[in-house]
Swiss-Prot record:
Keyword annotations from UniProtKB, A to Z: Cell membrane, Membrane, Quinate metabolism, Transmembrane, Transmembrane helix, Transport, Ubl conjugation
Functional description taken from the UniProt entry: Integral membrane transporter that imports quinic acid to be catabolized as a carbon source.
PANTHER family the UniProt entry points to: MAJOR FACILITATOR SUPERFAMILY (MFS) PROFILE DOMAIN-CONTAINING PROTEIN-RELATED, PLASTIDIC GLUCOSE TRANSPORTER 4
Species annotation: Aspergillus fumigatus (strain CBS 144.89 / FGSC A1163 / CEA10) (Neosartorya fumigata)
Protein family (similarity comment): Belongs to the major facilitator superfamily. Sugar transporter (TC 2.A.1.1) family.
GO CC aspect terms: plasma membrane
Subunit structure: Interacts with creB.
Keyword Transmembrane helix: yes
Post-translational modification note: Ubiquitinated. Deubiquitinated by creB, probably to control its activity or amount.
Gene Ontology biological process: quinate metabolic process
PROSITE patterns noted in UniProt: MFS (PS50850), SUGAR_TRANSPORT_1 (PS00216), SUGAR_TRANSPORT_2 (PS00217)
Record-given protein name: Probable quinate permease
Membrane-spanning intervals of the chain: 23-43, 75-95, 98-118, 131-151, 160-180, 194-214, 286-306, 326-346, 353-373, 388-408, 457-477
The organism's taxonomic lineage, starting at the top: Eukaryota, Fungi, Dikarya, Ascomycota, Pezizomycotina
Length: 542
């Protein structure tokens, strides 16, 4: 088998790979467009002279400016931290669809509040709006990956959850370029900096409109006892009748997983909290999920996202427009590489190998950039044009982006969406998303101070964390590509970790062959023509 071949846990009818599943993933991923845009535009907006003049940055000390900038950026992450947890009861009781509508509504209210800010009113409305927007994206970062993973066929689950990451990068691309556009085309004014804030309403509006038409997650419906609705939605998504053998297998696996949960963790609202504190298997996976986001943020990527002018200045780029243009190129590179990751790598090369390769390559590039800054000290020796060493440093910076983006950028979100059983999934994803926003908050809050105090040492610091992540992934993180959600317990119990995927996949294929043999022995047609009453229960074929 080719290393880039799709991995199927069982023969999958071509009808399963239909446009509906991609459409649902795309609509849900407007949440990540909100996140990506908000993460990208704020740093360069704070660098606009019109914004700095209106809010009196010119009268503040450098320390005060760094503090205010860090507060504006980081209150968004603080809101997102709590939003990730608030989404748990909504997703549990009301479902994934209503959770997405909640996220879009709160974000829209926050974006609208920010539009009321000006020099006379001060920064209060910006702070309040950023916190509300953070609550919205925190909720969305919890619910969206779960929603997509619960609908996705195992063989393309990484690709579909990857659409969430693609939305993040597209939003980021717009956010990186919009300030360059307004700075080049508009004179410094209130209008110049308020336009980037207003654009936030576009992805949230699209989410609110699209989410109305989304199908509820079949697995959530099963967990709530709404079996008829669950089978109907699953048939619509898979484009197969309820009595097709593929559907019988999938529904049977969900039933079995729910029964196992009922006898172990339990299906109530509070049961997952008890499991999170007492069940060693659950605690271990929560630890893995949180640490994946620790290493992701330890790559330094969010320091670049939020403070790109500061980052590029440390390499030797001078001038606001030059930094904004370089930031825009950074966004283009991330988006292009994300397409490659989405279409060819995540479900073919897998999660584990991508993380290992990405960490090694990113670490080398960060070390080279840090060494250049240490030797050349471009901040203390500015030149009109970049030197050859500076150009090489920029090359390795963009090469770092190429290594990081198809590995650590989206893969932790994919893995956290698929590691847990159904009733644990909402709380576990809440913990994982909150963990991401916690590390994100710390990076965004202290990056200006780190660059002021550590200078080139910041690059070595992030490189060291990337090297340590290699050890973590190799010994503790199993490969999950192609493994059904209902078989994750077996995967994480298999040892050694680096062979677990092959072991479990072989067992799944053996069980599937036996299941089909038993079905055929009982007189069931391979084409699914015979009615299977305990599954379809008088549902019409779709």
């Amino acid at each position: 088998m080719s290393i880039l071949a799709l991995v199927e846990d069982r023969p999958t009818p071509k009808e399963v790979y239909n446009w509906k599943i991609y459409l649902l993933a795309a609509v849900a991923s407007f949440t990540s467009c909100m996140i990506g845009y908000d993460s990208a535009f704020i740093g360069t907006t704070l660098a606009l002279s019109s914004f700095r003049e209106e809010f009196g940055f010119s009268t503040m000390s450098k320390t005060a400016v760094n503090l205010v900038s860090a507060n504006i950026v980081s209150c968004y992450q603080a809101g997102a931290f709590f939003g990730a947890f608030f989404a748990y009861p909504i997703g549990h009781f009301w479902g994934r669809k209503w959770g997405l509508l909640f996220a879009g509504t709160i974000f829209t209210l926050g974006a609208g509040l920010m539009l009321g800010a000006n020099g006379d009113r001060g920064l209060g409305l910006l702070y309040g709006g950023r916190v509300l927007a953070g609550l919205g994206v925190g909720a969305g970062s919890n619910i969206t990956p779960i929603y997509i993973s619960e609908m996705a066929p195992p063989s393309i689950r990484g690709r579909l959850v990857g659409v969430y990451e693609l939305g993040w990068q597209i939003g980021g691309l717009v956010g990186f370029w919009i300030n360059y556009g307004v700075s080049e085309t508009l004179a410094p004014s209130h209008k110049q900096w308020i336009i980037p804030f207003a654009v936030q309403l576009i992805p949230s509006g699209l989410l609110l409109i699209g989410a109305v038409f989304l199908k509820e997650s079949p697995r959530w419906l099963f967990s709530r006892g709404r079996r008829e609705d669950a089978i109907k939605n699953l048939c619509w998504i898979r484009q197969l009748p309820a009595d097709h053998i593929y559907m019988i297998e999938e529904i049977g696996a969900v039933d079995q997983a729910l029964e196992e949960q009922r006898t172990t963790i339990g299906l109530g609202f509070w049961k997952p909290f008890k499991a999170a504190g007492t069940n060693k298997k659950v605690m271990y996976r929560l630890f893995l999920g949180s640490m994946l986001f620790f290493w992701q943020n330890g790559s330094g990527i969010n320091a670049i996202n939020y403070y790109s002018p500061t980052v590029f200045k440390s390499i030797g780029l001078h001038g606001a427009n030059t930094s904004m243009f370089s930031t825009g190129i950074f966004g283009v590179v991330k988006t292009v590489v994300t397409f490659v990751w989405l279409l060819y790598l995540i479900d073919r090369l897998g999660r584990r190998l991508l993380l290992l390769i990405g960490a090694a390559g990113a670490a080398v590039c960060l070390l080279i950039v840090g060494a250049y800054i240490k030797i050349a000290d471009p901040a203390s020796n500015p030149t009109q044009e970049m030197t050859g060493g500076g150009i090489a440093a920029m090359f390795f910076f963009y090469l770092y982006t190429v290594f990081y983006t198809p590995s650590w950028n989206g893969t932790p979100w994919v893995m956290n969406s698929e590691m847990f059983e159904p009733n644990m999934r909402s709380l576990a994803q809440a913990c994982a998303a909150a963990s991401n926003w916690l590390w994100n908050f710390l990076i965004s809050r202290f990056t200006p101070q780190m660059f002021a105090k550590m200078e080139y040492g910041v690059w070595f610091f992030f490189a060291s964390l990337m090297l340590l992540s290699i050890v973590f992934v190799f010994f503790l993180v199993p490969e999950t590509k192609g493994i059904p959600l209902e078989s994750m317990d077996v995967l994480f119990e298999s040892k050694p970790i680096w062979r677990a995927h092959a072991t479990v996949l072989a067992k799944l294929r053996e069980d599937e062959e036996q299941f089909r043999h038993d079905i055929e022995e009982s007189g069931y047609s391979k084409t699914g023509e015979q009615q299977v009453e305990h599954v379809s229960e008088d549902l019409p074929k779709v």
